[in-house]
Amino acid sequence: MIALRADVSALDPRALPELLRRLRRHRSVQVGECQWIAVLPGSGPVLLTSGDRLVLDLLIERRALLPVVIDALEAELRSGGFRERIALRWSTPDTVPVPLR
């Protein structure tokens, strides 16, 4: 399994609260004070952690699926008028957040 992380920063101060509300409309469960696991189209379960930025963590079976999952998540994150309101930074961290273990 490969850990994938998206750090989402706001270019508009209202963007992150609105984006988080939209993402939580998908089937989700709260797992911490500021954490939810949501099932997003094309990527499966994603850990959402809110704070001064929004962090999305997920696990992917094979490295070959990284571009497919990144494309699906970018499409989900940038839809609904968010294309110019957020900045995304992708990484593959060495550790997996506890709620995803």
Predicted regions and their residues:
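A general secondary-structure signal for short beta-strands and their flanking turns/coil
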Residues: 1-3, 51-53, 83
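Short glycine-/aliphatic-rich beta-strand segments at the starts of folded cytosolic domains
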Residues: 1-24
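Hydrophobic residues positioned within well-ordered beta-strands of beta-sheet architectures
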Residues: 4-6, 54-56, 88
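Residues that cap or initiate secondary-structure elements
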Residues: 12-14, 44, 62-64, 94-96
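Short secondary-structure junctions
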Residues: 26-32, 80-85
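Short, intrinsically disordered low-complexity segments
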Residues: 29-64
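Polar/charged, Gly/Pro-rich intrinsically disordered segments
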Residues: 38-43, 93-101
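C-terminal structural segments of small proteins and small subunits
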Residues: 64-96
